Amino acid sequence: AYVPTDGNGKRAAVLSVHGHWPWARVDPVPHARALGLVKLGYFVLAVDAFGAGERAIEPARGTYHGALLGASTWPVGTPLLGLQIYDNMRAVDYMTSRPEVDGDKLAITGASGGGNQSMNAGAWDERFKAVIPVCSVGTYDAYIGAACCVCEVLPDGLAIAEEGEILALVAPRALMVINATRDGHQFSVGEAEKSIARARPIFELNDAGKRLKHAVFDSGHDYSKPMREAMYGWLARWLRGEGDGSPIPEPEIKLEEVDTLRCFPDNVRPKSFTLMPAFVHEQAKKKLARAPRPDHRERWEAEALMMKTRLEQRIFGGFPRGVDWKVEPAEKSEGQDTREETFILYPEPGMPVPGVLVRG
């Protein structure tokens, strides 16, 4: 926690969440904004994401909670994205318990994966009165084929909503989306504009059009000083009622060494500390203990039918039923000892599968 020293009394507070920076919450990128905010009088809580930083299996520079590790939470029905939302909601519980914090003046911000955390937690937890995702907003459609972390993937998301609808859940609270002109396609200005266009009518329905802003910077993937200064101005307007939302110059800051910011400088953590693999195993035990134990054949047949239906719909995405298929012959040719026929099989409309039949 970063606690201002300029007097007593309750003050606005910011939850700072990190993206995939080498040192997680203590990396210079998130550390810089926390210092700027506390110098401007905000209480700041910076947290490590589950499986990253000091919550990694082996805390070190460059720890990563994605790939197979992050996907290991899916079989127990708790995607990493959902765990991060819950984590951040509990962080708000802690912040509001602090005597320095005004629980009616809370915000969340972060860049990259931290921007996605900001968008998602900001959509779900209405205690955040200002939400600022940075270098993260695009479209779920653009995620297809992109190298995103599993912590940013909403399973079955496109079957329910696009990213614009998630942004719209923030309304009528204040939302500033920050993008960079030289970012990846999935986080690009053009993709973000599509989502903001979907969200804007909802803000206007709530008489909150002025609470939605898109700020674009000539930059790569970052949370740069100009971006931070835009964030300071937006928070001043919507948390403190000061100014018109224009950027506020960053006070002079001096970055501290990474080791001075660690909770466990020697990497010795309490025995009660839960790592991701242990969490998944514990969840699996609890859920398996609730699995049905049929005691006769008829009950098993009923359970089996229910299980197959749930697996098909919730896990396998559903299978086509009653779909017409057809075969279109293409060419025939004869060799010395064989005959070949090429054809196109359509197992579903619009899905051609070429094939060759060889007769000897």
Residue ranges, per PLM feature:
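Mobile cap/lid helix-loop segments that gate and shape the active-site cleft of serine hydrolases
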Residues: 74-75, 83, 128-172, 180-196, ...
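Loop/turn elements at helix/coil->beta-strand transitions in domains of secreted/extracellular proteins
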Residues: 10-13, 40-43, 102-105, 126-130, ...
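Cap/lid segment of the alpha/beta-hydrolase catalytic domain
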Residues: 9-100, 137-149, 360
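Flexible loop/turn segments at secondary-structure boundaries
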Residues: 22-24, 52-56, 115-118, 138-143, ...
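Primarily recognizes the serine-hydrolase "nucleophile elbow" in alpha/beta-hydrolase
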Residues: 21, 40, 90-161
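Alpha/beta-hydrolase-fold catalytic nucleophile elbow
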Residues: 48, 109, 134-135, 178, ...
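Alpha/beta-hydrolase-fold serine-hydrolase catalytic core, especially in secreted/extracellular enzymes
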Residues: 9, 171, 178-354, 358-360
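Glycine-rich His-Gly loop
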Residues: 5, 16-22, 180, 347
